[in-house]
């Protein structure tokens, strides 16, 4: 009887921890999207005001395409997370999905911040410009809450491999 109660307690603790991990990873994914959106907004303001070759950077097709691509990645990621939130709130077990959301959102966040920094040129690397902080802050997202490699391992296990 003692071992049975002990086992039940361990299972309750494990279930509670897993539920908290699910919520933490979903929260991290949501934060990554918000952070990427902030970096994009900051960059949009910059390319509308910065001039090169006699015109605003926002007039160059390559830059317009680059920013359109980043905005699309952010929106698609946000939509995925928006789908998970009510399911999580209803108590659905979403280990695979929140692992996907955490790793994907933090990778998108890093890509957005990296590519936005690139559009600032040398200014992007200077600490006087907020985009440099966006870039630095984005890097750690792929580490905490479980590294993205761990997220991929969890996803693979959920796929039965």
Where in this protein do the model-derived segments appear?
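Single conserved hydrophobic/aromatic residue that forms the stacking wall/gate
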Residues: 1-13
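Alpha-helical interface subdomain recognition
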Residues: 19-161
